[in-house]
C-alpha cells in the first residue's frame, strides 16, 4: 500500500511514500497472552482481522483509544465531575444537604466546587422537597442534647453525625460583621452576656439633650433593660411585643432584633432628623418642641443607616456669576473659590466646550473609536486652548438635551484622520479620552444648556464658563449614579 504520486512534468518534487501497515504493525510489540480481553487497542488481538474494523466499529462509546493514552475511566469507577469524594455515599444518602450554606455569599461560594447545580446535588444526596430547604438540618445555636447510639446501630450514620457531613459541605463562615440572627424568644441565660451585646455602633437620639424626653419610645433599638416584673404583672401589650414570659431576666423583642440590624430608623423613622425636613412642624406636636431645640446645637448627631439618597447640589445662578470676587477683586469660581477666572468666566487650566450632537451614528462611532471631528467654526479656539490648558468636550443631544457624556481631548487638531461620518463642515479630527458615557435626561442639564449663551440656547462647539462646565460634569455624574442606584 503506497501513496499515489500526483507529480506532473512541471513539478520537480514528489510526495514521499508512506510505510505500509505491516511495517507499522511490526514496530509495536504483540499483546501478551495473559492480558485481559477488556483491553482495547489499535492493534487487534486477531492478526487476520483488518485494523479498520476495530477502529470504525461503533458498538461501544469507549471503543477506541490511542495506544499512547490511558482509556477513559468508566462512570462507576471514577465519577466524572466529582473531585470531592466521601468514604461511602450509601452511608449519607439519608442526610439533608444544607442548602442555606450552599448558595450563600461567602467569598468562595461562587467558585467551583461549592456552587454546583441543584439537580446534581439532589441526585447525589437523594434529597427531596423544595430548594433551598425550608429549615437547615442543624441550627447554629442548637440546644438539643446530642444523640447516642450503640455500636451496632446504623442510625448514627445519617442522623446526627456532623463530622461525616463536614466533608461535603462548605466551611461555616461568618458572612457579615453583625451578630448572628436570633430566634423569636431567646433562651434565658443567667449570669452570662451571650445574648446581650453592647451597642457600639450608635448612640441614643437623646444623648445631646439635657434629659430623656417623655415621648421617647420604651422599646428603643437594641437591648435596653427595663424593670423586671413577675408573670401576672405582664400585660397583654408586653406579650404582644415579644417579651419572654418565663425566667427572672427578660429582654424586649423588637423588629430590629430579628436580623440584628443596628438601624433605629426602622422603629423611630424621625428620631434622628428634624421634622421640618420630613413633614410640617405641627405634624408631630409631642416631638416637635424637643427636636427643634436640637437644631441650635452645633454638633449634630451621627447620621444613621439606611442612608438617604444623595441630594443634588443646589442650583447655581449663573447670571450673577461675575459678582463672585476675591480680596484682590479677581473673578473667582462659584463652585471652587480657589479657581481664579478671567472676566469671561474662563479658567486658564481647564476649559470646556459643548458638542451638540444630532447624529446617533457619530456619537456611537466616537464612543467606540475615541475620535471626534471638530467643525471649522470652533477649530481654532479648540486648538489654541489645547496648547495652554486641559480641554474637555461635553456631549449633549441637540434635540432632547440628553447628556451623552464628557471626555478630555488628548491630541491636537488634525492629528488623526477624520471619521467616516464627517463632511466638508469639519476641519479635522481630535483624539479624546472618555470619562463618562451615558444617555440620560436631567432637567437641570437641559436648563443650563438652554440658557448658556447669555440666556439663549447653546451653539455647537461654543466654549462655556468654567462654572457651567464643571457643573455639567457633576450633574452627569449624579445622573449616572442615580440611574444605576449607587447614589446612596
Curated annotation (Swiss-Prot):
Spans traversing the lipid bilayer: none
User: Which superkingdom does the taxonomy of this entry point to?
Assistant: Eukaryota
Ranges of Basic and acidic residues compositional bias? 71-80
Its annotated compartments are: Nucleus
According to the UniProt record, list the residues that bear Phosphothreonine: 176, 312
Bias regions of kind Polar residues — which residues?
Answer: 1-14, 33-47, 54-66
Subunit description? Component of the erh1-mmi1 complex composed of mmi1 and erh1. Interacts (via N-terminus) with erh1 in a 2:2 stoichiometry. Interacts with rrp6.
Name listed for the protein in its UniProt record: RNA binding exosome specificity factor Mmi1
Please tell me the species this chain comes from: Schizosaccharomyces pombe (strain 972 / ATCC 24843)
Amino acid at each position: 500500500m503506497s501513496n499515489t504520486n500526483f507529480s506532473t512534468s512541471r513539478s520537480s518534487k514528489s510526495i514521499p511514500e508512506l510505510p505500509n501497515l505491516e511495517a507499522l504493525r511490526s514496530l509495536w510489540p504483540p499483546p501478551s497472552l495473559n492480558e485481559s480481553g477488556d483491553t482495547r487497542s489499535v492493534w487487534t488481538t486477531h492478526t487476520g482481522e483488518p485494523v479498520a474494523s476495530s477502529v470504525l466499529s461503533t458498538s461501544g462509546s469507549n471503543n477506541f483509544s490511542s495506544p499512547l493514552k490511558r482509556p477513559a475511566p468508566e462512570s462507576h469507577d471514577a465519577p466524572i465531575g466529582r473531585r470531592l469524594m466521601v468514604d461511602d455515599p450509601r452511608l449519607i444518602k439519608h442526610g439533608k444537604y444544607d442548602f442555606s450554606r450552599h448558595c450563600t455569599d461567602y467569598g468562595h461560594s461562587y467558585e467551583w466546587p461549592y456552587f454546583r447545580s441543584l439537580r446534581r446535588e439532589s441526585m447525589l444526596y437523594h434529597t427531596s422537597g423544595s430548594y433551598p430547604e425550608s429549615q437547615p438540618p442543624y441550627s447554629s445555636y442548637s440546644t438539643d442534647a446530642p444523640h447516642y447510639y450503640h455500636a451496632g446501630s446504623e442510625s448514627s450514620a445519617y442522623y446526627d453525625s456532623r463530622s461525616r457531613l463536614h466533608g461535603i459541605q462548605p466551611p461555616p463562615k461568618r458572612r457579615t460583621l453583625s451578630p448572628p440572627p436570633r430566634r423569636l424568644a431567646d433562651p434565658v441565660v443567667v449570669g452570662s452576656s451571650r445574648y446581650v451585646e453592647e451597642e457600639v455602633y450608635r448612640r441614643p437620639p437623646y444623648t445631646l439633650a439635657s434629659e430623656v424626653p417623655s415621648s421617647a419610645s420604651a422599646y428603643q433599638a437594641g437591648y435596653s433593660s427595663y424593670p423586671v416584673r413577675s408573670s401576672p404583672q405582664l400585660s397583654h401589650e408586653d406579650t404582644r411585643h415579644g417579651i419572654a414570659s418565663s425566667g427572672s431576666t427578660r429582654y424586649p423583642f423588637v423588629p430590629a432584633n430579628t436580623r440584628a440590624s443596628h438601624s433605629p430608623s426602622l422603629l423611630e423613622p424621625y428620631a434622628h432628623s428634624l421634622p421640618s425636613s420630613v413633614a410640617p412642624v405641627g405634624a408631630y406636636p409631642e416631638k416637635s418642641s424637643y427636636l427643634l431645640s436640637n437644631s441650635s446645637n452645633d454638633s449634630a448627631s451621627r447620621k444613621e443607616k439606611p442612608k438617604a439618597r444623595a441630594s443634588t447640589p443646589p442650583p447655581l445662578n449663573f447670571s450673577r456669576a461675575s459678582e463672585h470676587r476675591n480680596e484682590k477683586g479677581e473673578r473667582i469660581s462659584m463652585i471652587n473659590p480657589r479657581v481664579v477666572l478671567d472676566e469671561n468666566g474662563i479658567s486658564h487650566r481647564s476649559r470646556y466646550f459643548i458638542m451638540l450632537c444630532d447624529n446617533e451614528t457619530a456619537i456611537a462611532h466616537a464612543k467606540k473609536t475615541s475620535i471626534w471631528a471638530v467643525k471649522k467654526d470652533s477649530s481654532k479656539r479648540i486648538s489654541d486652548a489645547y496648547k495652554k490648558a486641559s480641554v474637555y468636550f461635553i456631549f449633549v443631544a441637540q434635540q432632547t438635551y440628553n447628556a451623552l457624556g464628557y471626555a478630555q481631548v488628548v491630541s491636537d487638531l488634525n492629528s488623526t484622520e477624520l471619521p467616516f461620518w464627517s463632511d466638508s463642515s469639519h476641519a479635522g479630527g481630535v483624539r479624546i479620552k472618555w470619562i463618562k458615557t451615558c444617555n440620560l435626561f436631567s432637567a437641570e442639564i437641559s436648563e443650563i444648556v438652554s440658557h448658556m449663551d447669555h440666556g439663549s440656547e447653546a451653539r455647537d462647539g461654543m466654549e462655556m464658563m468654567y462654572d457651567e462646565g464643571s457643573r455639567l460634569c457633576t450633574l452627569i455624574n449624579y445622573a449616572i449614579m442615580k440611574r444605576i442606584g449607587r447614589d446612596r
